[in-house]
């Protein structure tokens, strides 16, 4: 009888221990399931971050391609502007050469005009001298008449020369006006070209600034891509580690569930044995 009581007490202790162990196992299982849920949540967050990182990488890559396209367009514009500047400089040189030729022609025309004016003045002085002599010497009328006729002829020639000089002067004045007009047009064109060169220079400086900014943005994009690539690699590493931890926890959960099932079976066996013992005691 004492042996039965001891056995019952031992079985009772085993049952209590088994019950405590089962409760501990259930609590451990709950904790494990909580950790598993937390890991699954972290894993989902990592997947979301990974997706966001991939999207940011794609956006940065597109921005980098756009920056490269803009940089190529800027280089083409700079090349075209440099070509335009060269053409404008050649045109300016041609205009300067035309202006120099106009000045030379104007100087030549002015010199010829001065010579014609001197010849006309000389003829006029000769005519006046002849007229004075005809008034003071009547005995020399015949001679003077001849001289006068000669003087008239000279005067006529002088008038013709004067008319020719006047005509040439008029032509020269027209040429001078045309030269002045061309000079003014050349000055205006030079001023216009200088303004165009100023604008082109400003545009070139602007394009150079844009080119520098594009280079800076390109460096920034490359750095961003490197950072995103590193973040992507880190996220992939964390995701792999999370999957490994999740697999490990799943195995631990399976093991604990197996142990819990074994403890429940053991507890059931102890309970059945106690029930059988109580039945045997009741039979006595």
UniProtKB/Swiss-Prot annotation:
Has keyword Repeat?
Answer: yes
Specify the signal sequence span. none
- Transmembrane ranges, per UniProt, are none
Q: Where is this region: Disordered?
A: 103-133
**InterPro entries for this protein:** Tropomyosin (IPR000533)
Quick check: keyword Membrane in the entry?
Answer: no
Keyword terms: Coiled coil, Repeat
One protein family per Pfam:
Tropomyosin
Instruction: Give coiled-coil spans as residue ranges.
Output: 1-284
Which PANTHER family does the annotation name? TROPOMYOSIN (PTHR19269)
Q: Which family does it belong to?
A: Belongs to the tropomyosin family.
Q: How does the annotation summarize its subunit structure?
A: Homodimer.
What the protein does comes down to: Tropomyosin, in association with the troponin complex, plays a central role in the calcium dependent regulation of muscle contraction.
Domain remarks in the Swiss-Prot or TrEMBL record? The molecule is in a coiled coil structure that is formed by 2 polypeptide chains. The sequence exhibits a prominent seven-residues periodicity.
Please report the name of this protein according to its UniProt entry. Answer: Tropomyosin
Species name: Chlamys nipponensis akazara
Organism classification: Eukaryota, Metazoa, Spiralia, Lophotrochozoa, Mollusca
